[in-house]
Amino acid sequence: MKILFVSSEVFPLMKTGGLADVSGSLPAALSALGHDVRILMPAYPEAISAAETPNALSLRQAGSQLTLLSTRLPGTTVPLWLLDAPASFGRFGNPYLAPNGAPWPDNAERFALLARVAVDLTQDRLGLGWKPDVVHCNDWQTGLIPPLLSDEPNRPAVVFTVHNLAYQGLFPYETFQRLALPPRLWKMEALEFYGQLSFIKGGLVFADRINTVSPSYAEEIQTPEFGCGLDGLLRSRKSCLSGILNGIDDVAWNPATDPYLPAPYGPDTLERKKVNRTVLRQRYGLPDDPEVAVLGMVGRMVEQKGVDLLIDILDDLLQLPVQLVVLGSGDKEFERCFERAAAARPERIAVTIGYDEPLAHLIEAGADIFLMPSRFEPCGLNQLYSQRYGTVPIVRKVGGLADTVEDATPERLAAGQASGIVFEPAKPAFLLEAVYRALALYREPEVWRAVCKCGMAKDFSWRKSASRYVGLYREALAGMNAGCSIADPRCAA
């Protein structure tokens, strides 16, 4: 099968979140299954620097001269095309946000360009001599590809993956006009969303198959609580909507071979995990007390991640035998709260604002407990890393967290099936109670070791998930023009 994978970020070329991890791992896993997968992404300066000596191919699109840089995804044999349009993508830093933290004012134009080039690529109008059977689109940045493809008589099948429904690519009507999109697309059944242009609706309406990155999230987004105003549309496409759990890069995230760890370890050498805890503590000047558990947290400091719940219980945590290590960035007020707490109690709380890949690995290995109290979580990766590293996650029962962590109930503990602590209401008191539960288990070394080993035994590799995506692609191919789309893709203006 020939698959074009389109994403606005791909690890290790550009990363702001889990989308990049998926885009850097899934194509390689599909290739390993024997499929011809090729990636298209913007040529950000960082991506060009990280790419392996790309070849430049000149092309024209809508009267503009553009360049397609042809290379390979680093560390793989997967072909990678970088869309080199300096006026749109030649900016260092966050690919979506300007230095002042506001979205780039031309984001609609930038990602409409990516969509148009993707469509031309699928129709072999760029002279590459290759046409995909399936186009796999990811999040709002690729949302215009499905509706633009609907005008093509020999289009490929389209799969649209929702990594986070909260980010929708909303722009005023004037942007719709400026992009010169077909007038027929300006209606409620297409791209119009309460008077605005919605990129994500393009994927949700026109794709042959839609999926989210966990089964629970696929169910949740059909409800008003999690549907972000699109739950009615998603319910109407329920027969074409499914959830496939993300995998993880089990080579990069392997405690037995992790180059970032001072003491690699496995299920049979779990005691070496304590060496990593000691090194983590030394990095921050935290006392090395075996009776004190280290709580770790890595991620964006935003309300979605439940960071405010943790901030609300900081005073209570300080009454417990724990230390807290936090790595992340986001909401400036949340950042300041953690910085103030660390300054006031440096022997108990350590914070690094920003992102540091080696440190993220060390926290996963050195922490005893990992905190992930998300308000919503399409899939989540850190709870998967934590279990692989024998670090017990505390998670909220939502989205991919609910699908991947087995709560340490008495029944599951007795059956050897418990891998973490799960709580439900998004309230500080319930997070604190979950910490109490974790510490009670921590005080029973044999029980604790069993929970750690249960998580380490799970298979979260991309091999399993990639096979499910192949099945989804086949469904999309079979379902083309079979009445699955709620909008007739060839309706008149």
Curated annotation (Swiss-Prot):
Any one of the GO BP annotations: glycogen biosynthetic process
Q: Does the keyword Iron-sulfur apply?
A: no
> Which pathway is this protein engaged in?
Glycan biosynthesis; glycogen biosynthesis
Which superkingdom?
A: Bacteria
UniProt key word Disulfide bond = no
What this protein catalyses is:
[(1->4)-alpha-D-glucosyl](n) + ADP-alpha-D-glucose = [(1->4)-alpha-D-glucosyl](n+1) + ADP + H(+)
Which molecular function GO terms apply here?
A: alpha-1,4-glucan glucosyltransferase (ADP-glucose donor) activity; alpha-1,4-glucan glucosyltransferase (UDP-glucose donor) activity
Q: Kindly list the positions annotated as binding ADP-alpha-D-glucose.
A: 15
Q: Which SUPFAM superfamilies match?
A: UDP-Glycosyltransferase/glycogen phosphorylase
Pfam families per the record? Glyco_transf_5, Glycos_transf_1
Class of enzymatic activity (EC top level): transferase
Instruction: Tell me the keywords, alphabetical order.
Output: Glycogen biosynthesis, Glycosyltransferase, Transferase
InterPro entries to which the protein is assigned, alphabetical: Glyco_trans_1, GS/SS, Starch_synth_cat_dom
Write out the GO cellular component annotations.
cytosol
**EC number annotated for this UniProt entry:** 2.4.1.21
According to its UniProt entry, the function of this protein is described as:
Synthesizes alpha-1,4-glucan chains using ADP-glucose.
Q: Which family does it belong to?
A: Belongs to the glycosyltransferase 1 family. Bacterial/plant glycogen synthase subfamily.
Know the name of this protein? Glycogen synthase 1
Gene from which this protein is expressed: glgA1
